[in-house]
A protein has these predicted regions:
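Helix-loop-strand module that forms the ligand-binding subsite of alpha/beta enzymes
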Residues: 56-136
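N-terminal beta1-alpha1 ligand-phosphate binding loop
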Residues: 2-34
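A general structural signal for well-ordered alpha-helical segments in protein cores
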Residues: 7, 20, 24, 60, ...
């Protein structure tokens, strides 16, 4: 595949020192050269309201265009109440509407969940996967990425310091590269 593939990365946490933003940055650094990962900011997206579909806010339009332009999507999220944070759910909803015009349709995807807790965002990871099935986002099934104890993976500057995690994420990104190439819309 000769061209570099554009991967839109959505980080579920809006927190300034987010573990998941650090994780997304690490994934970008470890990605094979065929993939260019860029974080799509979701914190300022207006809350989805179907009443605005006929005259959508500029933020919705720009977000939808950015997702449509991407070759693939990667979600990096913490877990809030066994689900994804509200900002990520809102972004998913904004990108999926109006009905029949989803920006997500057919884009190969993957989910990485990270948290300080031991289960590594398992609930959020699987809840998000349910939405991706409905949105026709073929999500990579293996390897799965539940990164528990993730607060210990990074130094004060946000750099990945855990060698085992580095190798796992490198392998994950290689598998994701293969998945994207196999599932990309032509």
């Amino acid at each position: 595949m000769g061209k570099t593939l554009d991967v839109a990365v959505l980080v579920g946490s809006l927190r300034k020192d987010s573990i998941n933003r650090k994780m997304a940055n690490a994934l970008a650094e470890l990605a094979p050269e065929e993939l260019k990962l860029s974080i799509v900011e979701i914190g300022q997206l207006p809350i989805y309201n179907q009443n605005a579909d006929e005259n959508p806010p500029a933020g919705w339009k720009a977000f939808r265009e950015r997702i449509r332009a991407a070759d693939a999507v990667l979600f990096v999220t913490p877990e809030h109440n066994r689900s994804v944070p509200a900002a990520l759910k809102n972004a998913i909803d904004v990108g999926s509407r109006p009905y029949g015009q989803s920006a997500w349709n057919g884009k190969p995807g993957a989910v990485v969940s990270a948290s300080p807790g031991g289960v590594g965002g398992f609930g959020a990871n699987h809840h998000l996967r349910q939405s991706l099935v409905f949105l026709n986002v073929p999500a990579m099934a293996q390897p799965e990425a539940y990164c528990g104890g993730a607060d210990k993976f990074f130094d004060a500057n946000g750099k990945l310091i855990n060698d085992g995690t580095r190798q796992f994420l490198k392998d994950f990104m290689q598998a994701y590269n293969t998945w994207v190439i196999a599932n990309i819309k032509s």
